Amino acid sequence: MSDTSLKEKTAKGLFWGGFSNGIQQLLNLGFGIVLARLLDASDYGMVGMLTIFSAIAAALQEGGFISALTNRKETLHKDYNAVFWFSLMCSTTIYILLFFAAPLIADFYDTPELIPLSRLSFLGFVISSMSIAPRAYLFKNLRIKDTTVISISSLIVSGIVGITLAANGFAYWGIALQSISFITVMTILNFYFSHWRPRFRFDFTPIKELSLIHISEPTRLDVIS
């Protein structure tokens, strides 16, 4: 890629990144206002109890692979493939641990309803892990317009799901399913726009190299987003 072409793509990426952030904030504000009128504070509290577990699991799951793949000078299919299967295995392991830890979480908060709610909510880790490789492919190729369409479309669909469920009395389940629908739509669209597909080859050699890249270098992704 020539310097001129890279500059043009970076400039477009900055534009679409800013546009995406603005639209997402407006959508979040709009959907948030509607949901606040339909739900009680206790409904948000139920989901909020799981936030710390979600944050820790999400950090462990992604592991900086998107930025590492974006930074790597030459990225091959085997690199994306290694990240896909490694992330899926890690997220599945985390989910299994949290699945069996659900009763302990519920006991800690003295809220039995958290058992089924947490087991549903934590499914998002497994689903989102499958989008790491194709999303990294889009960022690597500076296809920020596509990631903008993906993010906005996912927000709209999940917002409609959340409002519909909340309006029909699903309470905190509506919030949980809104999150799951957002992750699911985003994962599907990442595959659709990237045209990247995993192969059943389990070579995790690139994982160590990508981990070192993430630790030692900044990333274009940080600038664009």
Predicted features along the sequence, with ranges:
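Interhelical loop/hinge segments that connect adjacent transmembrane helices in multipass membrane
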Residues: 1-6, 10, 145, 188-216
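Transmembrane-helix boundary and interhelical linker motifs in polytopic inner-membrane proteins
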Residues: 2-11, 36-42, 54-88, 92, ...
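Short, amphipathic, aromatic/basic-enriched membrane-interface segments that mark the entry/exit
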Residues: 14-19, 141-151
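Membrane-interface helix-capping segments at transmembrane helix termini in multi-pass transporters
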Residues: 36-50, 72-82, 95-122, 165-176, ...
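Single conserved hydrophobic/aromatic residue that forms the stacking wall/gate
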Residues: 213-214, 218-225
